[in-house]
Curated annotation (Swiss-Prot):
It catalyses: L-arginine + H(+) = agmatine + CO2. It comes from Sulfolobus acidocaldarius (strain ATCC 33909 / DSM 639 / JCM 8929 / NBRC 15157 / NCIMB 11770). The lineage of its organism: Archaea, Thermoproteota, Thermoprotei, Sulfolobales, Sulfolobaceae. Pathway: Amine and polyamine biosynthesis; agmatine biosynthesis; agmatine from L-arginine: step 1/1. The modification Pyruvic acid (Ser) is found at S78. This is Arginine decarboxylase proenzyme. Is synthesized initially as an inactive proenzyme. Formation of the active enzyme involves a self-maturation process in which the active site pyruvoyl group is generated from an internal serine residue via an autocatalytic post-translational modification. Two non-identical subunits are generated from the proenzyme in this reaction, and the pyruvate is formed at the N-terminus of the alpha chain, which is derived from the carboxyl end of the proenzyme. Gene3D superfamilies: S-adenosylmethionine decarboxylase. Its cofactor is pyruvate. Binds 1 pyruvoyl group covalently per subunit.
Amino acid sequence: MSQQLSSQTPSNQDRIVGKHVFGNLYDIDDKLLMDKDLLEGLVLEAVKIAKMNLVEIKSWSFGGKKGGVSVIALVEESHIALHTWNEYKYATLDVYTCGVDSNPQAAFEFIVSNLKPKRHQMFFADRSSE
């Protein structure tokens, strides 16, 4: 009697698939960076584009020398966080998902295309379980 050996590679259902796209956006129109409603709308649309499921979205405006806006979307798959500093014309963007079918890069690229920074950096991290 012969035995067959099967591959023990875990399927996506047997592990967490963590996809993390994050980066820095430089030299953005400071009027965009202070428009809380616009920024919240961009994050909401990015949730849809990335095929994520929104749980809640919150946003805050901060004054002072390092003032700006923070928008955080809690999604079933994880989160999108956008933080701006208008005086520096700078923003950071973090899109993390554990959803197999979600696309954090699409969300990142959508927000970047709408904020139109003169320069940006995008990084990827695989945060999947083993």
